[in-house]
Curated annotation (Swiss-Prot):
Active site positions: D325 (charge relay system), H372 (charge relay system), S637 (charge relay system)
The EC number(s) this enzyme carries: 3.4.21.-
Swiss-Prot/TrEMBL keywords: ATP-binding, Glycoprotein, Hydrolase, Membrane, Nucleotide-binding, Protease, Serine protease, Signal, Transmembrane, Transmembrane helix, Transport
ABC transporter domain residues: 1450-1687
Name of this chain's protein: Serine protease/ABC transporter B family protein tagC
Transmembrane segments annotated in the record for this chain: 962-982, 1027-1047, 1072-1092, 1157-1177, 1260-1280, 1288-1308
Taxonomic path: Eukaryota, Amoebozoa, Evosea, Eumycetozoa, Dictyostelia
GO biological process, one term: protein processing
Any matching Pfam family: ABC_tran
GO cellular component, one term: plasma membrane
Ranges of residues in domain ABC transmembrane type-1: 1031-1314
The keyword Aminoacyl-tRNA synthetase appears for this protein: no
Protein species of origin: Dictyostelium discoideum
Amino acid sequence: MKFHFSSNKLLLISGLILLVLVIGIKLDIFLSSKSTEYIKFNNNNNHFKRDKRILLHNEIIDTNNKPSIKNNQIFINDNDNNENISPILLRILNNNNNNNNNNGDDKSIYKKNHYIVQFKDRINDETREQLKEFLIGTDIVLDEQPYQSHIVHYIPHDSFLVLMTQEQSVLLSSKEWVSWIGEFEPSNKIHLNYNEKSIGLPVYIILSDSTNSLIQRWENTLNSILKSYNSKVKLTLINQKKLKSIVYCNDESPSPSCSLINSEKLVYQWISEQSESNFIERSEKFQTANRLSPKVVFGTKDTLVNNDRVDIPLRGKGQILSIADTGLDGSHCFFSDSKYPIPLNSVNLNHRKVVTYITTSTSDDSDKVDGHGTHICGSAAGTPEDSSVNISSFSGLATDAKIAFFDLASGSSSLTPPSDLKQLYQPLYDAGARVHCDSWGSVSVEGYTGSYSSDTASIDDFLFTHPDFIILRAAGNNEQYLSLLTQSTAKNVITVGAHQTIHENYLTDGPNYINYQSSVDINQELICDFDSRYCNYTTAQCCLESNATTGLASCCPTLLRKSVIDAANTQPLLYNENNICSFSSKGPTHDGRMKPDLVAPGEYITSARSNGANTTDQCGDGSLPNTNALLAISGTSMATSFAAAATTILRQYLVDGYYPTGSIVESNKLQPTGSLLKALMINNAQLLNGTFQLITSSSITYPSNQVFENFAGASLVQGWGAIRMSNWLHVVNNNNSNNNNKTSDGITKFVGIGGLDLRLVKPNQWKEESLSTGQNTSYCFTYKPSSSSSNSGNNIPRVVATLVWTDPPSYAGAKFNLVNNLDLTMIYYRDNGSTIFYSNQGGSSFLGLAPTQDTLNNVEGIVHNPTEPMTYRFMVAGTNVPMGPQNFSFVFHGENGEFEWADKCPQCSPGQVLACPVENGIGTQLCTSDLQWSSCLIQSCDNNYNYNSIKKRCDKFLSYNYIIMIVAGGTMLLIIFILLLIKYQEYKESKKDSFRRFDDGTGIFVRPKDKDAKVSLADLYNLISPFIIELAISTACSLVSTAASILQPFYIGQIINDIPTAKHIGDFKSQFILIFILAVIEFVFSTISSWISGIVNEKMVMRLQNKVFRALIAQDMGFFQKNNAAILMNVLISDTPMLRSALTGILLSIATGLCKFVGSLVFIFTISWKLSLVFFATVPVLAFITQIQSQFTKRLTRALLFYNSKASQHGQESMVNMHVVTNYCRQDKEIIKYTDNLNNVFQTARRLIINNTLASSIKWLMVESLAFIILYYGAYLAIQKQFTVGLLISFCLYIGYVIDSTTTLFGVYVSYVQSQASATRVFMILRSAPRKRTTLEEEEADRNNGLGGGGGNNNNNDDDDDDDNYNGKGNDNGKGSDDPNNNNNNTTLENIDDNGELTTVQPVELTKKQLKKQKEKEQKEYFKRTGISVVEMSLIPSSYIELTDCKGEIEFKNVSFRYPTRPDVQVLHNINMKFETGKCYGLVGPSGSGKSTLLELISKFYPLRDGGNIIMDDIDIANIRPNNLRGFVTCVHQNPYLFDASIKDNIGYALDNPTIEEVIEAAKLAYAHEFIKDLPQQYDTVLGSAGSLLSGGQKKRIAIARAICAKRKIMLLDEITAELDPESEEAITQSIKVLTQGHTVVMVAHKVAAVRDCDKIFVLDKGYLVEEGTHDELMERKGKYHRMFNNEKDEEELLNNLGLPSNNETNNENNNENNNNNNNNNNNNNNNNDDNNNQVVGEQV
């Protein structure tokens, strides 16, 4: 379909619609600003103002003040080299003749650099993926930077550090989700100091991406810079993203010309400016940070256990614990295996204790004397092969576990771990270790800062990518706050501090196995410095003289041991497991994170002692005491080994399936993640109650740029507390058969793991859950006091919840290192209706306020002591997850009570009532008995909103959304429904045939159907389908106008409501403005709708009339013989506009009426459903009345069309035959007959008016009565305060709208009924038009569906075909031919009775009753036949032979023929004749012999169906397209039709653009030029109607000139010499002789004399060919031709003897004028007229 609006009109319409939408939005905002505020609930602290600063370690960027890169800013910094060199360095290079010129290379904008990209909102998975897709889609990779743009790190707040091109940064700034973009300053990459203490130490450079050629290129450039400083730089590749750099002097020792400080500054400033560098930091020096200790680790808060297999049944069996340290003395009995040697750099799982021992180029395969590593391994898992020896009592904690060891030192040298820590952890992980112990680390050269380094990020990264691995690291032994080892600040590790051991240890094991000699050596140096005479004292001398000189006791080992024992004896409260070791490093980290996480025993820990690289067995016979095999050491290193061993045992507990029953169950075998192990360890820790408590932050001096927070249940000294495994690690055995909820000391405990509700999920199915930004999940547990325990003393109920997640690695240069922020909140609902929230910070809060959440740590915990039965709800929320989704582990435990998983999470407290946010109003929710909120019940609505009793919500009657709902929604649903319905009908019909191939150029598709087929909706849709877009726009505009109109009464009612309380007219300002705007909208859109629909109406009637006219002129000849021209013109002129008005009006009326009806219906039911039901009680009655009305209307409309057609027919016949009317003086008779017809029209129209008026009056009376009832009942409801007076007024106005729309919709049905009569007549013509079939298969389908057969079959809608007359020379009886009023179609609609018999006009006057019966009979005939006789459409073959040239040879072979209108009469019988080119042939015979029929068959006016073929140039004309055939054939009839046009136009009619020369030449050949020249205007003379200004002979010569001008090979002449004077006959005869040259001429004549000169004459008689030959040959035969010739000759002689004029002369004066009118009459009835036939038949394609 085509859209027929110009672009200007479309722009105008679009602009107006856009204007209305903008106004709607503004109104919505205006009204929303006046609406009441409703309660808002906070979600994840969104009510706090977001901090949008970018927090880097070296800089804080305020993005509100610092300008962002804009999309119109491109700064090109061209440089030949990949390296961007600062001005000072560029100057140095220039001084060293190293040219670096700016070439203005446009590729500079494609060079990558670091940018900070801040998002407008919190980063989630979607926005992060959008950034990734943008970087991939817009990336350009250069040869000098062979890596892709990508996200490097997350930086708080809401930012990413991104490596991308400058062009990408500019493009990215236009994204709506980006708020700020800035270049990453090189100074933010540098994190090192330049002083004598640190100078010369290696510096590590973290790269953003790997590059192979980087080192050599950088070294060359930097060494050229350092020449003038007499220094060099050495770069070493650590891994693909890490370099080590050392700056050194060229000389062996520093000289005045070598300044390392200045050299380093230049080097690292230059490196920081390179796009590949990401982070630069100084290398740090690494340092190293039990028979009684297990009793503490597996004890409880107040009770210790025995170090045996009863109280500690699990010892890490099946687990591999990895340790990296100074070395391991493999010959020690704790580690040696009599069967296997220690596996060096290989894996042997069969070794009793050590499965692998990994060494590097900087380490060996042993430990130094008293080595740190051997002691750590012994504390963790060492045990002798023979467990019966006494020394086994000093075995490690996880004695059944095996060790994977990584040696970090060689001999007595310091630790040198791999620069890439992944190279340390990966081989241990591959060996099967899942728990790792690191009791070493480094402290920043800048002091105690708790900094986060690249090593720290590397540890976090390894744990993030290996989620089932956990690392435990020593906090350090530096005793101050912020003194944590750098690697221990990693977020994902378990950082372990040290607390003291049990009091017994200070009296026995510790004093016995401490290496006092190291202390003596140190103290003796101090004494020597004090007094030189003591420098050479031995320990014996110190002991001997200690009484005299007190200070000498410090170099006496015996006295040192005694001092330890004495201190423990005298101060038992200071020396026990409840105190922190004074040396243990304390938190927080530099960004305020809480470290350590846990503490474990770390003072005087006795374990394996290394004797260095020897093969002796230090254990001896295993007896005690054994100082060669055992050593007591203090430090967080020792604590870490115990914590790692405990974690290993915990992992065994889960992996072997002990949880939760305490016995091994196969389905309970759980594969824990590192975060789960960490969460369980922290969750079951106990805060120490000793003398070392957390000092308040007010008394501590912290660096000014640090942030510190307090946490409930944790401290910066001991983290979440000391490890106490027996709090929940429950194992059932023969000696200790405790149940799951009871430990050995009787404390009941329940442990729950998030996502592992044992009623629903088995442990072996467990996996971590994950969250993204904005998501949350909840875990709920119930608590009831235990019947077997009291809430006093140590039995106080307690719940602890812990949340842990493995956070992605942070950028080391960020101020805060948390990337993904999850938040844990505990909610419980009390019986008194209050709701209490707990979080990791700030304790509890009430009354719906969200608690303060932790934004720093990836560990959150909540501790609570319940006092009453309750249900806990723990909610984990993804507050900010830029690198999501984030996996997490949640652990809950409850003790001293009965705990279990809740069936469902509670939402409220019993009896609690809460204001709930409802749309556009305020509601309340009640807490039900199951602690769930009920649905929100609306209490009140905001201003400009009202409660919708149907939808049960507050609706805003004028808002942008509401307008869209009514207009857009209503329009689309309505139009889509109608179109789908019609398309469905169309689809059903298309299964039979695809009708769209019947388009004839008008854009209207009409599928041929049977003559009795009803007009369907699909048929009607085909008529309006070309205009559907315009109609849709018009309908949409009308709907907008309607929507605006139905909104006005509501505001009118509001004004009335507010009048009593209004104090000033200005109070109604907004309502008046809204009503005015609505009125303007209604006016504008109704005008547009009317304008478009008016144009569509005219377009449609034009196209429909064109379509009908095309269908008429494409009909076969029989159609015009059977139908009256007046009736056909009435269909063309009257029915098509009526049908058009009905169709376009129906669509528009349905749309607007339905919209107004539905819209008003919404309002009236919203205002009062009771009044609405009162109204709708009468709708069925109104529908019934309308149905009765439509039935009468349908019949009366058909009758009206019948009488209108008769009046038109009579009027046209009178005008055409005016000569006859005047000649016989019958004017009065015709006036009376026409008046009778008009009277019938008037009477029918009056009855139709009475019918409609009566129905309308009844409906009006019912509506008015209903209005009275509604007003009465509405007033009653208003008095009862059920609604206001204003709403009553609005309701009444809307009722008017409903009535109006109902009337419109009922009227649509009436209009549809009225259109059926017109539609039936129009579609009868449209469906009968000949059409072409495209394929042979389609022809077969048409025949099967009853549509086949070709044109000419008499399958019209007459009841009887036998009496259909054909008026022509072939009419056998010729009845009526002498009647001057005869239209040569005597079998018209009006004079055929029901039986098909002819009726004659009765001369006798009829009575009124008889006249009435006759009218009813005529009406019945009309209703049955519709006034139109239709021959079934001709189905044209699917393919033709196209002629490009024609010789003019024609041959009839056995041709027989019957006219379609008279199938019972055979006109031709087995005709055989041949016409050759260049010759003239004559056809003679009496009237009705078939002469003219032969000419019509040559022109293919009728198809042959009774046998035979007509061959032209050896081609059957049935296979030649009709128009193609007629392009070589021209026919001149006896009574030629001339158009009311100039002579030039009449002669050149057959040509598209004839020249005057061609016209004159044709006129000369036709001997018409002479008389044309004598006319006043010559060839421009207008001939009048049917050529009335010319005589008969002149008209025939003009017709012959037209045929000559057509330049066609075959000339058919039908009686062209009849009724002419001798002069005209002679001129025409000469013309024929001219035409014969090069043409095939066939003449038909009654007079044989007219054809005597023809080359051959064919004689026909009663349809048979009786003779053929030349004139002489036929005369000699004395046959039919001879008799006809002699009869004519005798008649001519008789007339001459009598002195009377011949027939030609007589007719020349009188008949020619009559012929003008008769010709016109005959042409209207299509009586074989040459020119009319050429036009009427048209192109049958």
